[in-house]
């Protein structure tokens, strides 16, 4: 099973944000990575939600079927693990992630501290 680390960062001075994701095998070797910079600013929760969505889309595109989606936003990971539905804008973004999770045979969610997500975070700054 591979691990998909994802992270999103707001560059408030430039009023843009960056997203990054890294797919690693169970030995920790990088299989694939992807970054993107967008010019519109969003809230931190929106950025993390959109990054998770893009990470799952990317993983599905490259043929991943079993994965652990790991991020450093505890609120985001908790929201994905809970089966709570709401019409709040951020909840709709969480629903997008849940819909994409149906493309996987097995998908687990895991929280890591920022230090554990350093590769994805560093990619954003590149």
Name these PLM-found stretches.
Residues 1-126:
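Primary recognition of RNase H-like, Mg2+-dependent phosphodiesterase/nuclease domains
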């Amino acid at each position: 099973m591979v691990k998909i680390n994802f992270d999103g960062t707001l560059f408030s001075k430039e009023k843009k944000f960056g997203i990054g994701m890294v797919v690693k095998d169970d030995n920790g070797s990088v299989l694939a990575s992807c970054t993107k910079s967008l010019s519109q600013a969003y809230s931190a929760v929106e950025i993390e939600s959109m990054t998770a969505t893009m990470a799952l889309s990317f993983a599905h595109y490259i043929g991943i079927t079993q994965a652990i989606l790991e991020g450093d936003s505890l609120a985001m990971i908790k929201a994905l693990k809970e089966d709570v539905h709401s019409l709040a804008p951020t909840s709709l973004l969480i629903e997008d992630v849940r819909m994409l999770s149906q493309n996987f045979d097995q998908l687990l969610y895991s929280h890591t501290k920022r230090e554990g997500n350093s590769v994805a975070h560093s990619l954003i700054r590149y």
